[in-house]
Amino acid sequence: MFLAKAILEGADRGLGGALGGLLGGGGQARAGGGNIGGILGGIVNFISEAAAAQYTPEPPPQQQHFTVVEASESEEVRRFRQQFTQLAGPDMEVGATDLMNILNKVLSKHKELKTEGFSLDTCRSIVSVMDSDTTGKLGFEEFKYLWNNIKKWQCVFKQYDSDHSGSLGSSQLHGAMQAAGFQLNEQLYLMIVRRYADEDGGMDFNNFISCLVRLDAMFRAFKALDRDRDGLIQVSIREWLQLTMYS
């Protein structure tokens, strides 16, 4: 067994060390397409009109049987579920290719973000850190959780991209990370910049989202393992490899 020590607010160096090896994702463009344009159009409407809001990491989504949750759903969520059902197919899950098509369809409607889109490799990375049941795909609750986060983070990106360059510079990025709900120490912040920013220190939208998806997943994983809430976790080598290798 070995001990991974971290404080969730990011002030302790242990969090920087623990998360540093887990940071991955990012990538360049690959166009979405296929025969799902009509279905995607319906889903895109739910993200295109997102209101500005700050993000606070939430508990991981719980998988529930459709009949349990449908009775208490709002009309918007019910319509969203119907669109998801058409897109997901009989297994009721979406994979990395479907996710790439959806995200790039959304980005095509937001020219101000000035990004070429998400690559398939980036979407595989996003799926892996969001895939709580390790099926290699996202179920409805996982997908909805991701979707809601992207809506909020899109608003944060727009708010801090004050020069409309499509990229967050060093001074903008610090504020954007805090507005997204992540209080990071300087060591971890610099590691993130080195991993996700370009040579000039700027971070575009798809790398910003990739970074926050992974940060959110790592915070949630730590909280789940820190059962007595003392800021310490103890994991076996097998648990550590399962946590780090798949994500």
From Swiss-Prot:
Q: Which residues bind Ca(2+) 3?
A: D161, D163, S165
Entry GO terms, CC = cytoplasm; plasma membrane
Q: Which InterPro entries match?
A: EF-hand-dom_pair, EF_hand_dom
Recorded hits in Pfam families, A to Z, give:
EF-hand_8
Name the UniProt key words of this record, in alphabetical order.
Calcium, Cell membrane, Cytoplasm, Membrane, Metal-binding, Repeat
* Gene Ontology molecular function terms on file: calcium ion binding; calcium-dependent cysteine-type endopeptidase activity
* Alphabetized CDD domains for the sequence: EFh_PEF_CPNS1_2 (cd16188)
Q: Which residues are recorded as binding Ca(2+) 1?
A: A88, D91, E93
Where the record annotates domain EF-hand, the positions are 118-151, 148-183, 184-212, 213-247
Q: Which residues bind Ca(2+) 4?
A: D204
Task of the protein: Calcium-regulated non-lysosomal thiol-protease which catalyzes limited proteolysis of substrates involved in cytoskeletal remodeling and signal transduction. This small subunit may act as a tissue-specific chaperone of the large subunit, possibly by helping it fold into its correct conformation for activity.
Protein name (Swiss-Prot/TrEMBL): Calpain small subunit 2
Gene designation: Capns2
